């Protein structure tokens, strides 16, 4: 599906149907990750950048929420080895690059609000690929059960320092970086997983989401020449 076809499909499918709710993520966990990412940046010495992001946190979170509306959530999957997504939708790495470039364009136009909104949507994908189901291109198989469990326990896995910075100079590469790590944890969070295996996997993957989000935010601000 080319870019024009995908844009048309997003318009037609924006209203969604009940099925899309089964594969959409939980945006409140993303909001938690965004908040922690900003804290990490501040603790890591990027206080000015963290202060700017904090002022726009509500806007970033709205972008995160928008990214799951309708069928857009079906473009949140990416096998890190063959680079394919959940067919026929685009892969998450390409979608992240597209959103990031749009955010940067809006920034250069002077529209900071729209830029941070789109940055939130792009960061959503970096975070989603810390979930093994997204890296394995598996929409079900315990996906929603695991994400609901994380929603109820995310505070237990909060980190506040040591962001992961300078992964790559390509927005898509941030998605692929996380997907490669998450890939190996699928057996621990699939329908055969247990609360014990959930906890083990989440102790690695949720801090990864927070730390790479800090790096991704700083990467954007550096690209914006801040």
Segments predicted by a language model, with ranges:
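N-terminal, motif-rich segments that launch catalysis or mediate targeting to/interaction with membranes
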Residues: 1-109, 117, 135-226
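Catalytic Zn2+-binding segment of zinc metalloproteases
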Residues: 126-138
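Short alpha-helix carrying the canonical HExxH Zn2+-binding catalytic motif
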Residues: 115-126
């Amino acid at each position: 599906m080319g870019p024009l076809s995908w844009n048309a499909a997003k318009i037609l499918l924006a209203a969604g149907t009940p099925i899309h709710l089964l594969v959409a993520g939980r945006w409140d966990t993303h909001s938690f990750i965004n908040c922690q990412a900003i804290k990490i940046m501040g603790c890591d010495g990027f206080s000015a950048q963290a202060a700017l992001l904090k002022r726009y946190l509500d806007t970033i979170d709205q972008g995160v929420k928008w990214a799951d509306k309708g069928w857009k959530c079906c473009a949140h999957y990416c096998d890190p080895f063959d680079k394919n997504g959940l067919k026929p939708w685009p892969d998450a790495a390409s979608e992240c690059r597209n959103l990031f470039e749009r955010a940067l364009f809006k920034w250069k136009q002077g529209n900071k609000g729209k830029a941070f909104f789109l940055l939130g949507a792009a960061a959503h994908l970096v975070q989603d690929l810390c979930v093994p189901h997204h890296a394995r291109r598996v929409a079900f198989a315990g996906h929603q059960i695991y994400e609901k469990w994380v929603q109820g326990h995310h505070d237990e896995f909060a980190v506040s320092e040591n962001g992961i910075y300078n992964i790559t100079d390509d927005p898509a590469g941030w998605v692929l970086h996380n997907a490669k790590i998450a890939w190996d944890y699928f057996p621990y969070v699939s329908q055969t997983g247990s609360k014990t295996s959930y906890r083990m996997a989440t102790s690695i993957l949720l801090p990864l989401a927070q730390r790479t989000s800090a790096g991704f935010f700083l990467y954007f601000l550096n690209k914006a020449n801040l």
